Amino acid sequence: MKYELKDDYIELFKLLKVLDLVDSGAQAKMIIAEGYVKRNSEIETRKRAKIIAGDTIEVADVIIEVII
């Protein structure tokens, strides 16, 4: 799956919401805090991590490529 950035970055929890991978912001924050999300193959626990073009996000079996 690809996500095209509209700005310079998007916060991680907002990306999960925009792509409908979670039902709410609270759920997004919970799965991030519990270590279920990887950024560039490393576990990312910062809910507001700035995701930029070139990043790859993994949630369960979904892989998201962030592009410009």
Residue ranges and their predicted role:
Residues 10-53:
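A basic, amphipathic helix-loop patch mediating RNA/tRNA/ribosome contacts
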Residues 1-7:
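A detector for short, charged/polar N-terminal pre-domain segments
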Residues 8, 16, 62-64:
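Residue-level marker of intrinsically disordered, low-complexity segments enriched
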Residues 4, 36, 56-58:
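Generic alpha-helical hydrophobic packing signal
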